[in-house]
Amino acid sequence: MSDRGQAFTLEAITASLLLIGGLVFALQATAVTPLSASTSSQHIENQQQAAAEGVLTTGLDDGSLRRALLYWNDSANDGSGGFHDAREEGYYVDKTPANAFGRSLNRTFTSRNIVVNVYVYYEEAGREKQQRMVYRGEPSDNAVSASTTVTLYEGARLYAEDGSPATTTITNDTFYAPNATSGGSYNTLRVELIAWRQ
């Protein structure tokens, strides 16, 4: 009986060594990482996408996006102005607008080294035209975008540099987007926000 017990013990030890050896081999043969590079990158892009959509939705809900669209300086009254305190191109290159929408962009993106471009699309003579609001360069391959629409109505007033409503109303001569409709609405603007990591 003792020979049989020794054989069973030897057999059990051999089986356990084979099992442990197989597990060690399997673990060494496969890489065990929490996220691969592409999965991690996709996760970051998903976060940026959600943030871009959130900024636009919040701006639409609290009115800051509409006010930013109307934050236009046309002191020459010829339609060729630009956003307040922007460079000579008429749009922001090295900063964001000095209003609630600009602060939201800074808080959400700029403070995290994420670059944004903001484009405003509008209809003119049946064709879509573009006005840059913020332009920081060409987006990278991993850029995300979100967009929303804002309808402006006839009689809407531009906003002064201090953020207060100005006396000037939007017309073809005072605003970048022309009156493209009739019946009370002035033009429907599509705002696109593109974000990418520097």
Set out the residue ranges of the language-model regions.
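Secretory targeting signatures
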Residues: 1-35, 51-52
